[in-house]
From Swiss-Prot:
It is an enzyme of class 1 (oxidoreductase). The gene is pdxH. This is Pyridoxine/pyridoxamine 5'-phosphate oxidase. It catalyses: pyridoxamine 5'-phosphate + O2 + H2O = pyridoxal 5'-phosphate + H2O2 + NH4(+); pyridoxine 5'-phosphate + O2 = pyridoxal 5'-phosphate + H2O2. The keyword Oxidoreductase applies. The lineage of its organism: Bacteria, Pseudomonadati, Spirochaetota, Spirochaetia, Leptospirales. It comes from Leptospira borgpetersenii serovar Hardjo-bovis (strain JB197).
Length: 214
């Protein structure tokens, strides 16, 4: 092992997490932590790792952006024909991970995934910068392309095509909502004795919470 890598470590000491102070609704508590991260000016606070897997269990992960927190789900948008989209089609489960190093906090969210309505996707799509809208139309995400010029020429072609007109929401693009059945809140502590509080859904859809060892 590279000795320089093995010696990299940080002692966590900023805060603590007590099960009695966390409430009974994990999504509300997530919103509280998210707002604290915003106030702390965490860089790209809504960036999250999205882990998916094929139907035979081959995993993949990438960074995407959270775009909405609902009462029962977390929403992001992407190309439905991308690698992640194809995996979610055949295996509609995912894990989201947020790591806010400035606050020494991590949140892990596991659950089933469903597409949001086309109406919701359309509203968000047209809130994006125009260049991003056209980019979503022209990019065959995750598929091999000959070179960058291929993308640039398609972008120029469709920019002219849509000049003075609204960009249509492409059929291959839209949102997903992750409906959690397990959420874990992690707070870094000294000596690696971190605080980990887990919420899991019972069969009656209520949440139970408990502490797990770090």
């Amino acid at each position: 092992m590279n000795s320089k890598i093995s010696e990299i470590r940080k002692n966590y000491s900023l805060s603590s997490l007590d099960i009695g102070d966390i409430g009974d609704d994990p999504i509300s508590f997530f919103q509280k932590w998210f707002e604290e991260a915003v106030l702390s000016e965490v860089l790209e606070v809504n960036a999250m790792t999205l882990a998916t897997a094929t139907k035979d269990g081959k995993p993949n992960a990438r960074i995407v952006l959270l775009k909405e927190i609902l009462e029962d789900s977390f929403v992001f948008y992407t190309n439905y024909e991308s690698k992640k989209g194809r995996e979610l089609e055949e295996n509609p489960r995912a894990c989201l991970v947020f790591f806010w190093s400035e606050l020494e906090r991590q949140v892990r969210i596991e659950g089933g995934v469903k597409k949001v309505s086309r109406e919701e996707s359309n509203v968000y799509f047209h809130s994006r910068p125009r260049g991003s809208q056209i980019g979503a139309v022209v990019s065959p995400q995750s598929y091999e392309i000959p070179n960058r010029k291929f993308l640039e020429e398609r972008f120029e072609e469709f920019s002219k095509l849509y000049e003075g007109k609204e960009v249509d929401l492409p059929n291959h693009w839209g949102g997903y909502a992750v409906h959690p059945n397990r959420i874990e809140f992690w707070q870094g502590r000294s000596s690696r004795l971190h605080d980990r509080i887990v919420f899991e859904k019972d069969t009656d859809s209520s949440w139970k919470k408990f502490r797990v060892a770090p």
